[in-house]
């Protein structure tokens, strides 16, 4: 149960009949309003808490076939959001299992101090995830406009001209320049928003994204942070795409 950071959903698997599906760790004094929530696997009223000293772990019977179906992903997330509304929570990634109550209590006891400390740090906070992209065509035009070497090599290799070495050199130069520009953009955005966050985690972006960053924000500043992110996005104008999600359970700040 120690691996609590977000990760891709697991492949379909069969769980032993007595296995438990794990949702989150909270303090044992958390209200734990679980009534009406649907468990992963579609069972209503199956959620409960296993307590160990100052900690509690929200569980339900594991479904026989654990698959990342949309309804189960939604059920997992709904539990996190209900818990987060009432207090600090350490959300588990989708698909985490434990053999039985005894194993859960042992896991809670084994990292009791760490979990209690982390719950204190995450009290009254939420995660915001921001992804941002810029059109690669725009970036390429910028490289060719601002880099004499890139422009010269591009002209030399246009219409099939130049040597193989010229084409390789152009490709390598453009790739480096794109990385530099994307990194610079990411640093600018993170620098602007970090002032309003208690913490940040920057992950590797995918595709044309130049940014994939998560910010830990005090819940009292959630609207302020959202507004600042929207204003920042508007300032970059056309050619940029910003995608903000939140408030979310603080998956990125558990480990």
Predicted regions: what is each one?
Residues 1-255:
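An interfacial alpha-helical scaffold signature
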């Amino acid at each position: 149960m120690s691996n609590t950071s977000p990760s891709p959903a697991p492949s379909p698997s069969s769980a032993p009949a007595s296995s438990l599906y794990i949702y989150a760790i909270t303090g044992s004094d958390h209200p734990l309003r679980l009534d009406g929530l649907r468990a992963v696997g579609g069972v209503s009223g199956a959620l409960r808490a296993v307590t160990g000293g100052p900690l509690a772990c929200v569980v339900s019977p594991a479904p026989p076939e654990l698959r990342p179906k949309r309804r189960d992903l939604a059920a997992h997330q709904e539990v996190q959001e209900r818990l987060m509304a009432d207090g600090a929570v350490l959300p588990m990634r989708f698909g985490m299992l434990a053999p039985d109550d005894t194993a859960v209590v042992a896991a809670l006891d084994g990292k009791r101090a760490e979990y209690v400390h982390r719950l204190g740090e995450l009290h009254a906070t939420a995660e915001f995830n921001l992804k941002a992209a810029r059109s690669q065509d725009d970036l390429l035009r910028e490289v060719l406009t601002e880099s004499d070497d890139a422009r010269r090599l591009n002209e030399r290799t246009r219409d099939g001209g130049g040597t193989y070495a010229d084409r390789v050199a152009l490709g390598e130069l453009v790739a480096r320049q794109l990385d530099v520009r994307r990194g610079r953009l990411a640093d600018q955005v993170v620098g602007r928003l970090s002032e309003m966050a208690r913490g940040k985690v920057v992950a590797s972006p995918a595709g044309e994204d130049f940014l994939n960053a998560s910010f830990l924000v005090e819940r009292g500043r959630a609207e302020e942070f959202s507004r600042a992110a929207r204003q920042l996005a508007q300032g970059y104008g056309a050619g940029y795409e910003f995608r903000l999600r939140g408030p979310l359970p603080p998956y990125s700040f558990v480990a």
